[in-house]
Design a protein with these regions (language model features):
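Acidic, glycine-rich catalytic/binding loops that coordinate metals and/or anionic ligands
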Residues: 1-13, 48, 130-183
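Short coil-to-beta transition motif at edge beta-strands of beta-rich domains
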Residues: 186-198
Length: 234
């Protein structure tokens, strides 16, 4: 992605690759330092250059580890991942020599979030990145001594690579936003005429706010369903 880039479809941000140029120097589950974790080490176009990279979604800082130039971020709302899942993104970025963020900071998709560096245990200028498709912020050491999230996914299942120049993608199944089409948006507040989705999409015919139910028509029959608290829209 490039600075300032945004991608929102159906009211949901697409989770974008934070790098303008991506050369993976160590992939997931690889020696020496990624055994058992879904991390990538990424440098830019030229070796040794401290390139900036950008927020893959609108997010807030959760934790920082200054000794290793490391910060944990979480999306403000659920995002769309490259594998089609919609959930919160929690991600860790490492080795930023210029890191100055603090827990609670919020930044918008496309704003600068970090700079490739060598802070901490690093053998060259790069960004170490891991992504969890959940709100779980647990940061756990595995049997190889490497830290990781619960619910980690390989990075080609996480971010879209629109406007990223892939120099070395380690054979990943990297996808564009066009590979994950967005269909009809389902109403979040039910009212008469709302569309709701079970195994298909149905129209709400009547609502009972007092008893927290909605009537839909399924295969020619009216069915009352319990629902989340309902709000009538005049």
């Amino acid at each position: 992605m490039y600075k300032g880039e945004k991608s929102v479809r159906g009211g949901i941000e697409d989770f974008l690759c934070p790098f303008t140029d991506m050369c993976i120097t160590q992939g997931s589950n690889m020696k020496p330092s990624h055994m058992g974790i879904m991390a990538n080490d990424v440098r830019g176009k030229q070796v040794g250059v401290r390139y900036n990279y950008f927020a893959p979604c609108t997010c807030k800082c959760i934790k920082t580890y200054p000794a290793s130039g490391q910060s944990m971020w979480q999306s403000i709302a659920p995002v769309r991942f490259a594998n089609g899942r919609i959930d919160y993104a929690t991600f860790m970025i490492c080795h930023d020599d210029t890191m100055n963020c603090q827990p609670g900071w919020k930044i918008n998709q496309g704003d600068q979030i970090g700079t490739m560096g060598t802070k901490g245990n690093a053998t060259g200028v790069h960004c170490h990145i891991e992504v969890s498709q959940s709100k779980d912020t647990s940061w756990i050491k595995n049997n190889y001594g490497n830290y990781h999230f619960n619910n980690e996914y390989d990075l080609d299942d996480c971010y879209f690579v629109d406007n990223t120049n892939i120099i070395n993608g380690y054979g990943g199944n990297w996808r564009l936003t066009s590979s994950v089409p967005v269909g009809e948006v389902v109403d979040q507040i039910l009212h008469v005429g709302s569309h709701v989705k079970l195994t298909g999409t149905y129209t709400v015919k009547e609502i009972d706010v007092k008893n927290n139910k909605a009537k839909i028509n399924v295969a020619g029959e009216d069915v009352w369903l319990s629902s989340v608290p309902l709000e009538e829209i005049k």
